């Protein structure tokens, strides 16, 4: 194998790690909605996490959703009262094709 090709393959593998869906969140009262679009050729698994402001209000996580290439998804969660914070986590989905 040529040394230049090995570096190129490593750079491509590192580049693949940044294939995550573009997401934005919206908070309306006690409800949080995440709007995600995946413009990349790899599937991204996203999950919405909501932290409620009140100590007695239970924090929640949505079920993970796989967003395929060019796909769009909306995830929602809520608190009983005010929302303290919300964020999205991303997890790459392994390529199901053998040999990759």
Where on the chain are the PLM-derived regions?
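Post-signal peptide N-terminal regions of Sec-secreted extracellular proteins
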Residues: 13-100
